[in-house]
């Protein structure tokens, strides 16, 4: 699929859920937990899925496991929404080889490539890293700027430089409203700007962004859908009221390191997504109690 074709598909995807990875007690992936979870997400207005991203605990998934997840979710979704595969690492060569492998699958719509972590590259190094990935296959690339996790930030002007590459079609921007506004104002026509911060979904959409790549949409998809509908209709006050209502719930989902809180909530709702792989650990009983109370309030 060409970059232009993927962009057209993503223009319909305002709420993209970064899918969790369910685990069994022995730490193996619980593929049996995916069908109900995925079907309920699509029913509550998830319009695209990120597979093997941060919320999926990608640092503790092997590439073989990621490929198994891609195949499983593709079979469940059957083309109903775009599938975006996490393909980025802090090793450019590894990322290049993996995106080549993912591109051959034929059913992945785009690759999500995170800023290289730990290495602390310069802006030129960041540019060359993403350029190498984008040039490695025909699979379009979404940049993933999340300095809170990886320390190094893709500065806005570097994103604009990367946006000139034909195969770089969007950004998941996990910084500030100032950066969102600057990017939305200055990116080339057709380049899509998503916030990766659930609490900034209202701001991103009202500024003219595409939408949100979300953790909270596991449980708040309907609310995001209604908020975006109000914005589209010009009813900003009504949209803001929804934002104010859901913000405490969103904050609860990030009160300890994600994805522990969303897994706590999903398990409480009967989705059997299990625990986390070390070095991440589950919420304590007290943390879980507070999170669930806030979500159910």
UniProtKB/Swiss-Prot annotation:
Known catalytic reactions: L-aspartate 4-semialdehyde + pyruvate = (2S,4S)-4-hydroxy-2,3,4,5-tetrahydrodipicolinate + H2O + H(+)
Domain of life of the native organism: Bacteria
GO BP annotations listed: diaminopimelate biosynthetic process; lysine biosynthetic process via diaminopimelate
Catalytic-site annotation from UniProt: 144, 172
UniProt-listed InterPro entries: Aldolase_TIM (IPR013785), DapA (IPR005263), DapA-like (IPR002220), Schiff_base-form_aldolases_AS (IPR020625)
Pathway connected to this protein: Amino-acid biosynthesis; L-lysine biosynthesis via DAP pathway; (S)-tetrahydrodipicolinate from L-aspartate: step 3/4
Site (Part of a proton relay during catalysis): 54, 118
Keyword field: Amino-acid biosynthesis, Cytoplasm, Diaminopimelate biosynthesis, Lyase, Lysine biosynthesis, Schiff base
Bilayer-crossing regions: none
GO cellular component: cytosol
Compartments reported by the entry: Cytoplasm
Primary enzyme class: lyase
One example GO MF annotation: 4-hydroxy-tetrahydrodipicolinate synthase activity
Pfam families per record: DHDPS
Binding-site residues, pyruvate: 55, 213
Gene3D superfamilies referenced in this protein's UniProt entry, alphabetically: Aldolase class I
Assigned EC number: 4.3.3.7
Function: Catalyzes the condensation of (S)-aspartate-beta-semialdehyde [(S)-ASA] and pyruvate to 4-hydroxy-tetrahydrodipicolinate (HTPA).
Family: Belongs to the DapA family.
Subunit structure: Homotetramer; dimer of dimers.
Protein name: 4-hydroxy-tetrahydrodipicolinate synthase
Organism: Lactococcus lactis subsp. cremoris (strain SK11)
Gene name in the database record: dapA
């Amino acid at each position: 699929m060409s970059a232009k074709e993927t962009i057209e598909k993503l223009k319909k995807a305002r709420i993209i859920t970064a899918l969790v990875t369910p685990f069994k007690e022995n730490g193996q992936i619980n593929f049996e937990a995916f069908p109900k979870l995925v079907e309920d997400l699509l029913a509550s207005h998830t319009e695209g899925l990120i597979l093997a991203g941060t919320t999926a605990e990608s640092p503790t998934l092997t590439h073989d496991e990621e490929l198994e997840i891609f195949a499983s979710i593709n079979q469940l979704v059957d083309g109903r929404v775009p599938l975006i595969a996490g393909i980025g690492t802090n090793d450019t060569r590894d990322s290049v080889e993996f995106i080549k492998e993912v591109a051959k699958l034929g059913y992945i719509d785009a690759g999500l490539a995170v800023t290289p972590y730990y290495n602390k590259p310069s802006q030129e190094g960041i540019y060359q890293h993403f350029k190498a990935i984008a040039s490695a296959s025909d699979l379009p690339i979404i940049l993933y700027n999340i300095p809170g996790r990886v320390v190094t930030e893709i500065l806005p002007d570097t994103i604009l430089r990367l946006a000139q590459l034909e195969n770089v079609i969007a950004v998941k921007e996990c910084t500030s409203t100032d950066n969102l506004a600057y990017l939305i104002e200055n990116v080339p026509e057709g380049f899509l700007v998503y916030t990766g911060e659930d609490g900034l979904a209202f701001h991103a959409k009202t500024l003219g962004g595409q939408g949100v790549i979300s953790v909270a949409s596991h449980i708040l998809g309907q609310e995001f859908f209604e908020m975006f509908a109000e914005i589209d209709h010009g009813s900003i006050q009504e949209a803001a009221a929804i934002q104010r209502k859901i913000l405490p719930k969103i904050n609860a989902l990030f009160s300890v390191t994600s994805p522990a809180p969303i897994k706590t909530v999903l398990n409480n709702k009967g989705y059997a997504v299990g625990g986390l792989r070390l070095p991440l650990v589950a919420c304590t009983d007290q943390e879980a109690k507070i999170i669930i109370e806030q979500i159910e309030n």
